[in-house]
Amino acid sequence: MQWRTAVVKNKSIIFADMKIMYCIRGLHNSGGMERVLSVKANLLASRGHEVSIVVLRLKGRKPFFPIDPSVNIVDLSAPYLSLPGHPSSANATSDSPRTTVSSAVGIASSPATGSARTESSASPVSSAAGIASVPATGASERLKGSVRKRLSRVVEMLDPDVCVSLCGPEVRILPAVAGGRPCVAEYHFSHDKFYRKYGGIFMYPYAWLRTHMLERAVSEYDCMVTLTEHDLPIWKRHCRRVERIFNPVTTPPGQVSRLAEKRMIAVGRLEDQKNFKDLVSAWSIVAERCPDWRLEIFGEGKLEHALRSQIARLGLTGSVILRGVVKDIASEYSNSSALLMTSLHEGFPLALVEASSFGLPLISYDCPTGPSEIIVDAGDGGGVGNVPAATLNQAAGNTPNGYLVPVGDVRTLADRICRIASDDNLRLRLGAASKASSHRFTPETIISAWEHLFSSLL
């Protein structure tokens, strides 16, 4: 067993290399949860831990975000499974994750053409997902039965030191099949997620039921990890131990923005929760006062058509642009001058964290939960005065780095946007404070906190 020393909260902690197993519903989506898991898994693997990701329904689809070749990926929906050290793993390609699965009995997809190959193939073929398909005749484990039975068998074969659920369907069964191993529930949403998602008097009982089922499930875990201080006392009523660990910055280090481009961006799914219609409405005011500035929104979702119609109706074509999903979001941050967010609620807004690492001023609705733990509001007067950037870097913890706006207050939102657009000095000062505050979210800081938690459970 290998031992290392890391610094957590200014203390030197000795860690042993661990076998860590994550469970998640899917990896093919471009959401924040998938992005964060890929970053954490890659970092933990680079620090000597053996990391496995059990995916409930990958179905041969390619993970949206890159996964390190040393990370095991197990597709629980596949009929065959081969694990590290298993004879059928020997033929896996060097650039594929160590765990190999088949997406269909005896059929693999060629990475170049996507064409099918039959089970008569001499060796498995690495798919576009970086997952090698195991022929039906290979010496591999056949996965049968319910999800519970499949997960139990996978835990037995992987033999992890600690099991982590991202609170998908597996959250109710993982402790029962973990064989006494420490289990951690990691929740990426606010406690009241279901009440907000299923609003209205008729759906209230269903929201209560979903919330109650989750509370009951996490009560069986050794630790619950939440993203915000706001939710700590709530979860402590339902789980024996609760910790708050921020999400890390998930974008690769890049060029800090010069804040010179007359361009602001928003990032997120085009869905009701993100509430981009308010942002577009606010921009109709901004476009009159600051006509040479533009807004670009990155994301996709069911409301794309409605947003395009709103943009056209308000005469904002060319001023507000829907850019879809991009994998290199880092370059977009580097070439923008502010990050805008109008969510109705959040778990922990990853876009704000990412943008702060590129030195962008942040403007957000003060929704529950998360923004107020990332943004220090500059107030009506700008709040920063003529404080030099060097001083801001030393006092990042409580130095204004943007604006918090009451939810639904479109006019105030537009006013705050115009302030940053029209005042170069204010924009630079807020950006410097934003960059300085981002040290709390560096991957190294966050991964050390996770290592400390895992070690304390062993």
PLM ranges: what are they?
Residues 401, 412, 419, 426-440, ...:
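A short, well-ordered alpha-helix in the C-terminal region of glycosyltransferases
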Residues 376-410, 419-424:
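Conserved acidic donor-binding segment of nucleotide-sugar-dependent glycosyltransferases
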Residues 152-153, 204-223:
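Membrane-proximal helix-turn-helix segments that form the acceptor-binding/catalytic region
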Residues 256-274, 280-283:
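Conserved donor-binding/catalytic core segment of Leloir-type glycosyltransferases
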Residues 325, 344:
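Aromatic "clamp/platform" in nucleotide-sugar-dependent glycosyltransferases that forms part
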Residues 165-170, 187:
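Short His-centered aromatic/hydrophobic patch
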Residues 230, 248:
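Carbohydrate-associated surface elements
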Residues 23-30, 43-106, 111-138, 234:
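N-terminal strand-loop element at the rim of the active site
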